[in-house]
């Protein structure tokens, strides 16, 4: 941490990691967006809420505002950096409770120009059957999307869930 990885001569791309911009901000004025761009990375991974419960309770936002934050954050980073991955935080929890909204968040990221959608089992509590069914639904709804998976191992199922995806 704190080293200039580019100076190491690695051939991998270095991506900055951060959240979507804050509600009420413009991307040009948002400290998170400016931090991501200012790091001068090869691209960015931006995480955003896909679980309606977290949008409304943790962020205190309405669902449409969250969609706009995702779309606008991705679009800004795409314009500034080129490569953008959208990390769909708590995707499988959101899909379980409100599948249409979780999918709409992914659509907003695609509309913003996301190069990849990373589906996250952020609390590590999903079962392989649930992960497989949700990934199939995403692939059906967004057939052109390049998908990735990010599974936590809280329940010892990260490998099984990754294979199910």
Identify what each model region corresponds to.
Residues 2-9, 22-147, 163-165:
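Alpha/beta enzyme core
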Residues 152-165:
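Thiamine diphosphate
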Residues 13-17:
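A glycine-rich helix N-cap at a beta->alpha junction
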């Amino acid at each position: 941490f704190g080293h200039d990885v580019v100076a190491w001569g690695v051939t991998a791309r270095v991506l900055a990691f951060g959240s979507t911009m804050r509600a009420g901000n413009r991307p040009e004025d948002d400290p998170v967006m400016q931090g991501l761009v200012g790091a001068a990375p090869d691209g960015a991974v931006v995480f955003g809420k896909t679980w309606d419960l977290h949008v409304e309770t943790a962020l205190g936002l309405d669902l449409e505002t969250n969609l706009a934050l995702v779309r606008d954050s991705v679009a800004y980073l795409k314009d500034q950096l080129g490569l953008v991955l959208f990390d769909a935080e708590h995707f499988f929890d959101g899909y379980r409770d409100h599948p249409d909204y979780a999918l709409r968040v992914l659509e907003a990221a695609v509309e913003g120009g996301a190069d990849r959608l990373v589906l996250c089992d952020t609390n590590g509590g999903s079962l392989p059957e649930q992960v497989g069914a949700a990934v199939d639904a995403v692939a059906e709804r967004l057939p052109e999307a390049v998908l990735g998976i990010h599974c936590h191992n809280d329940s010892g199922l990260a490998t099984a869930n990754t294979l199910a995806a």
